[in-house]
Every structure is written in structure tokens, then in C-alpha cells.
Amino acid sequence: MAAKDVKFAGDARDRMLRGVDILANAVKVTLGPKGRNVLIEKSFGAPRITKDGVTVAKEIELEDKFENMGAQMLREVASKTNDLAGDGTTTATVLAQAIVREGAKSVAAGMNPMDLRRGIEIAVAAVIKDIGKRAKPVASSAEIAQVGTISANGDAPIGKMIAQAMQKVGNEGVITVEENKSLDTEVDIVEGMKFDRGYLSPYFVTNAEKMTVELDDVYILLHEKKVSGLQSMLPVLEAVVQSGKPLLIIAEDVEGEALATLVVNRLRGGLKVSAVKAPGFGDRRKAMLEDIAILTGGQLISEELGVKLESVTLKMLGRAKKVVIDKENTTIVNGAGKKADIEARVQQIKAQIEETSSDYDREKLQERLAKLAGGVAVIRVGGATEVEVKEKKDRVEDALNATRAAVQEGIVPGGGVALLRAKKAVGRINNDNADVQAGINIVLKALEAPIRQIAENAGVEGSIVVGKILENKSETFGFDAQTEEYVDMLAKGIVDPAKVVRTALQDAASVAALLVTTEAMVAELPREAAPAMPGGGGMGGMGGMGGMGF
């Protein structure tokens, strides 16, 4: 086991504080509409330019191990806020730095760190309650656009694009962000249920130009197992032929004699048919087949339920207005399922999302929910260079996360105003224990940090801005750093999602309180390099070669 270096008390806190300051100072230059970019070296390819706090925080690794521990704890603040709210990482970092610095001063002055921590927790609880009271629900598409615009750094087209995508797919829908090959940024809406399985044979293609299968007013047979024999399928095929409508078969697989017969029927024109594999694997495949059954008003043919393929009737088949299948994907549009059944299934999936602790499972459940409840929108981010596209993609992702958070918990005045106004709620708290009160006062002072930083990044004195806002009695009065004017923040559309502000403060205070109560730090001592091997003394027995006449 390697030897360790241990630092105590003031020495430990000083080193830790240096690390906190290095990371926070690199991150906080990005805050606000006039925040600057940070350029990050990459081991290969062009450097990355970003205005995203968590991206900067993740890149910082310091040489001094004690300083690095402080920096890594602060990085944890940004990461946690990003995971929970998807935005507000820079605000969280600025708040954490302010709490740690004031806390370290108080500890150095002889106050009890555990009492300080209690005071910090009491004050944070009061602020969160205050933010909850101030939050205003997001009602219109215009308000969603405002949130997106602010989070994308004043880029109005991005805000509008996100609002448009949310309007199309609903709040439950999935919106993904991808890089575009062209210069333009655009929204692509996929209506209906789309899954990543294509046709099993190119002979099913109905549109040779696009190489797609297009089936209108179609019957859908959903089978849990493989279909390989023809005999069991004959009754249902004959019934579909008589109805004169096309048929789509979704099963674990269709192979052998069954697939050959379907292809021959399709080519002879007797039956307009196509077959695809069921999406997903194992239990997830079964769940997705059940989703499709509910969406199309059909029944999943499963031997567990006592239904065999031979006994299937037309009533058991699902229906849809249109199905489009290409080489890789299948899209079912306007399924004939009952609204009440679909809604019940949506609620069931929502309950599973609440219960699951696995991020992977949650993501898959959300995908299923979106396919049932609304659809999928893809925002394709374009730009002139790869560096520009990546920078813009960071901003679009932040804006998307912010709008989702706004829909969940509502909006509050932006630009650091909500935290500044919460000072009133904290100021009302009085505690008999002087050290606990000092902890409350630490948060009271830290609540000014984000608005001061926004002002300073805009080249304005932070303390003057804070003073002017607090003088005004209006709860929504604040500083527009873009125009350097004092305005009504809600009327101007400068808003923050309440969830982002709340999460930023909670995560900042949680990690900062841990740092304030740290009394010792342990790090591995750097290993001394092993001495180099002594130089070789030549090959033995070669000494007599000196006389050779070279």
C-alpha cells in the first residue's frame, strides 16, 4: 500500500479552497447572457468551445491532489444538478463557491462546523419553500419558448424550435438532439409509434423508388413467438384476403415456409402483406408488443393466454390507418385503440418510471411512454464547423432540459432575482445558537452570488445591481444583463424554471456543507521514480577486438 499524505484543519481547508476557486472561476465566466466561452483542449481533433458549466467542470483535473479533491467535490455539484434538472450547473457552482468561502472563514474564526451546517440546511429549506410559493405554472407555448431562449443564451430560434417540438409531441413525448449534416438547425417530428425494425424481405416493398412498404387501413397481427409453419397461419390469412385489406405481421421472427409463402402471395398480388420482427428483447419485447396491441386495438397472440395462431379471428387483429416500413424502421400511424385503454397504459408506465431505480430502465420506459402518448421529435443542430455544431448542441440540450423542468414545477423570475428575493424569507429566521445563526447568514450572503456574477460578466458592478433590485418593492423587478436595463423580468420573458433554481441551491448547499465540515484530508504521496538501470558494460569477452583493423 502506498504511503499517504495527511493535511489537517486550516492547512487542509486552504488547499481545498484553492481547488474550489480554480474550478468555480473557470465555470462562472460562462454565467448569464454576456458570459464568455471556455476553450477546452482535446487530446485529438479540434479544441472544444463551450458555455456549458458542467462540460467545463468535467474537464478540470488539478496537479495538486488536495486542491484536486476540492475541485472534484465542486464538480460533483455541477454533475448532480445536471442529472436532476439538466441545467443550472453554473448557478449551482457559483452558489457552492460562495457558501464554501464564507463557511471556511467562519470555521477559521472558531465557529462549530456542525452548527454551521445545521444553519445552512435551515436557510436552504426556507429558500426552497419560498421558491415553491413564487413559481408560476407554464401555460402557453410562448412561455416555453421564453424559457428555452434564456437557457440557450438568448438564441430565440432555439427557444421557438423547442416550443414547436413540445407542442407537437406533448409534454410526455421524447425530444432528442442530434447533429445535422447541413448548416441549418431543424425539427423533425415522427408521428405515431416508430420502432427500429425493418421489413424481413425486400420483396414486400410497395414503393420501389423509396424502397418502403406503405400499407393503408391495415390489419396488424401481433404474435409473441416465431412463425415458421404455414398451416397455423392459413385461417387468418384467408380471412384477411376476403376482407380485401392489407396485413402486417409483427412477431419474434417469421421464417422458412411462412416467410416464403407470404413473399409469393405478395408478388402474385393475392395478398398485400408485410412482416417485421418485434422490437426489443425478452420481457421488454413482450411489453412493447402489448403497447402496440393497445395502440391498435388488437390482441397479443400468446400461448400463455391460451390463444393459438390457428384460432385467431379478424376481431383479434389490430388496426391502423397507415403503416410505413423501410429497411430499418416501422412507423404505425393512427392506431385504432380506445383512448381510455391507451390512457390507462400510459398511467401504468408512469407508475413504473416512478418506481424504477435504474437509469437505463427509466430511459426505456420513457421511450415507450412517448411512443404511446405523443410521438418523437428530433432537433437536428447544424453549423458551419464541427466546433460550432458541438457548442450549439450543448446550448440546445440545456434549453431542452430547462423547458422540461419549467413544465414540471413552473417558472420564477430569472437572472438570479428569485434567489435574491428569497433573502427576505431567510432574514426572518432567528436562532438562539450563534453558530447556527452564522450558518443561516452564510446562505443569506450566498443568495446574492449568482446575480453579482451575471452583472460582473456584463461589465457592471454587482453590488450596485443588488442594491437597486432590493430597493424596488416589485417581486419581479430585476436586471436584464443583455441590455443592461432594469426591467420587469416576467414581462420581458427573463425566467428560470423553479426546478432548476431549487436543484442548484440544494446541490450546492449539500456539497458545500460537507466541505465546510471537513477537518482532515488524505491523499496518496507521489511515488518516486525508480532509479534508471546502470549502463551496460559492453559485451563480455569482446575486449580483444581492439586490434582488429577496421
Swiss-Prot record:
The entry lists its GO molecular-function terms as: ATP binding; ATP-dependent protein folding chaperone; isomerase activity; unfolded protein binding
As recorded in UniProt, coiled-coil segments are none
Q: What InterPro entries does this protein map onto?
A: Chaperonin_Cpn60_CS, Cpn60/GroEL, Cpn60/GroEL/TCP-1, GroEL-like_apical_dom_sf, GROEL-like_equatorial_sf, TCP-1-like_intermed_sf
Query: Does the keyword ATP-binding feature in the UniProt annotation?
Result: yes
Subcellular localization, as worded in the UniProt entry: Cytoplasm
Enzyme class, one word?
A: isomerase
Instruction: Name the major location.
Output: cytoplasm
> Where is it found, in Gene Ontology cellular component terms?
cytoplasm
Pfam families in UniProt: Cpn60_TCP1
**Which reaction(s) does its UniProt entry say it catalyses?**
ATP + H2O + a folded polypeptide = ADP + phosphate + an unfolded polypeptide
Quote the EC number. 5.6.1.7
Q: Where does ATP bind?
A: T30, L31, G32, P33, K51, D87, G88, T89, T90, T91, G415, D496
Q: Name one GO biological process term.
A: protein refolding
Q: Which domain of life is it from?
A: Bacteria
Q: Keyword DNA repair, does the record have it?
A: no
Q: Which UniProt keywords apply?
A: ATP-binding, Chaperone, Cytoplasm, Isomerase, Nucleotide-binding
Q: Which family does it belong to?
A: Belongs to the chaperonin (HSP60) family.
* Quaternary structure annotation from Swiss-Prot or TrEMBL: Forms a cylinder of 14 subunits composed of two heptameric rings stacked back-to-back. Interacts with the co-chaperonin GroES.
Protein task: Together with its co-chaperonin GroES, plays an essential role in assisting protein folding. The GroEL-GroES system forms a nano-cage that allows encapsulation of the non-native substrate proteins and provides a physical environment optimized to promote and accelerate protein folding.
Question: What's the protein name?
Answer: Chaperonin GroEL 2
User: Which organism's genome codes for this protein?
Assistant: Rhodopseudomonas palustris (strain BisB5)
Q: Which gene encodes it?
A: groEL2
